UniProtKB/Swiss-Prot annotation:
Modified residues (Methionine amide): M67, M91
Organism lineage: Eukaryota, Metazoa, Chordata, Craniata, Vertebrata
Pfam families: Tachykinin
Domain notes: Neuropeptide gamma contains alpha-helical structures at the C-terminus which may be required for interaction with a cognate receptor.
Protein name: Protachykinin
Keywords: Amidation, Cleavage on pair of basic residues, Neuropeptide, Neurotransmitter, Secreted, Signal
Species of the source: Carassius auratus (Goldfish)
Annotated Gene Ontology cellular component terms: extracellular region; synapse
Length: 114
């Protein structure tokens, strides 16, 4: 058993060493003299390219807002009236002037503590 393990290791090492090609690999030339992609990148001015990309506006079909696409059936844009003293949030509609609102109650509590 002690003789078998070193002989297998030596056999695998010899297979690795003699399994390699000894000649130069001329067909696998990864570093060619002319790199077409790099030449195209160097021709354009990088600063102008960055500014052009920053100032480019999205096309109308590319821009989709937070609420998703609008349906083409309702093409009319209707303006909703905004009430000055009301707030519609995730908890529902609340008015700032109502004394039973949460904000009004906290203001009253702070005034009483002073």
């Amino acid at each position: 058993m002690k003789f078998l393990l070193p002989s297998i290791v030596i056999f695998l090492v010899l297979c690795q060493v003699f399994g390699e090609e000894l000649g130069p690999k001329e067909d696998l030339d990864y570093w060619t003299g002319s790199n077409q992609v790099q030449d195209e990148w160097l021709q354009a001015d990088p600063f102008r390219e960055i500014i052009r990309r920053m100032t480019r506006k999205p096309r109308p079909h590319q821009f989709i807002g937070l609420m998703g696409k609008r349906s083409p059936a309702n093409a009319q844009i209707t303006r909703k009236r905004h009430k000055i003293n009301s707030f519609v949030g995730l908890m529902g509609k609340r008015s700032q002037e109502e004394p039973e609102s949460y904000e009004w109650g906290t203001v009253q509590i702070y005034d009483k503590r002073r």
